[in-house]
Design a protein with these regions (language model features):
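Short hydrophobic beta-strand element within catalytic cores of glycosyltransferases
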Residues: 144, 160-170
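Conserved donor-binding/catalytic loop of nucleotide-activated donor transferases
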Residues: 137-139, 155-164, 183
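C-terminal alpha-helical cap of glycosyltransferases
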Residues: 225-242
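Active-site-proximal region of nucleotide-activated glycan assembly enzymes
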Residues: 1-55, 60
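C-terminal "capping" alpha-helix adjacent to the active site of nucleotide-linked donor transferases
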Residues: 184, 189-190, 194-211
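A short, well-ordered alpha-helix in the C-terminal region of glycosyltransferases
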Residues: 205, 212-226
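Donor-nucleotide binding loops and adjacent catalytic segments primarily
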Residues: 53-59, 63-144, 174-178, 189-199
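Short alpha-helical segment that forms part of, or immediately flanks, the ligand-binding pocket
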Residues: 133, 151-159, 178
Length: 242
């Protein structure tokens, strides 16, 4: 069994009683007899050299390859609070010395008051990206949900991030981010606090402090686990032999 979330689901809790091997993605997962293995991910992400890939990644995403970049994404389904917060800052975009890539989610394009695709200087929106390695390489700062895969990939590649846990469910997204947040390797903000005012205040302030971004990224990288796919594959093969 592999438990992805820091708060195990019922099926895995029951199955873990009989499993020959249980791997968990996060160190704070309350699972008896579990082994910390991390989250299996593609090698393109696990072993990504962000600095070497940065300029190409930004070009792939339609961005200025030389400009500092904030990327906002709620995943493939989007996140209404993140989308609304970004849209509310439209009048500020031209003032900032960084660009924003806004990944809105499939079918969640952000429109202006005329029903046209929201457009502004230093701003680009797309509905989704098939290459998350480009997203991680291009970003100087991520504003994202804290699903298990996202948190694990953020740590593996060492990208500074602000996590906004999904406000519904059983609280697993906040728990997923806990180890990074407690290590000062990432920030966590409640969904209800993410407004246009918050974005306009906090994002430019953090982007103006590249030393802090570098420190966050390095701290995240130290906590990253990059060989989970291999470890889980070996565990499955070993269990099958018994």
């Amino acid at each position: 069994i592999h438990e992805a979330n820091a708060k195990p689901g019922l099926a895995n809790r029951l199955g873990g009683t009989f499993a020959k091997f249980t791997g968990v993605a996060f160190p704070n997962t309350p699972f008896p007899r579990a082994t910390l293995v991390g989250m299996p991910m593609k090698d393109e992400i696990a072993y990504l050299n962000r600095e070497a890939h940065r300029s190409k990644a930004r070009r792939n995403l339609g961005l200025d390859p030389q400009k500092p970049t904030v990327i906002v994404t709620g995943g493939s389904l989007g996140a209404l609070s993140l989308n609304n917060a970004v849209a509310a800052c439209r009048d500020h975009f031209a003032e900032w010395d960084f660009q924003i890539l806004h990944i809105t989610g499939k079918g969640k394009a952000v429109l202006d008051e005329n029903g046209e695709l929201l457009s502004a200087p230093n701003y680009r929106q797309i509905e989704f990206s098939n290459g998350m390695q480009d997203v991680y390489a291009a970003a100087d700062l991520l504003l994202v949900r804290s699903g298990a895969a996202t948190v694990s990939e953020v740590a593996a590649v060492g990208v500074p991030a602000i996590f906004v846990p999904l406000p519904i469910g059983n609280g697993e997204q906040a728990l997923n981010a806990r180890s990074l947040v407690e290590a000062s390797a990432a920030l966590l903000v409640k969904d209800a606090e993410v407004t246009g005012e918050w974005f306009a205040r906090e994002i430019p302030a953090l982007m103006a402090n590249p030393e802090e971004l570098e420190r966050m990224g390095a701290a995240a990288y130290e906590l990253g686990i990059r060989d989970a796919a291999r470890v889980m594959a070996e565990a499955v093969l070993k269990a099958a032999e018994k």
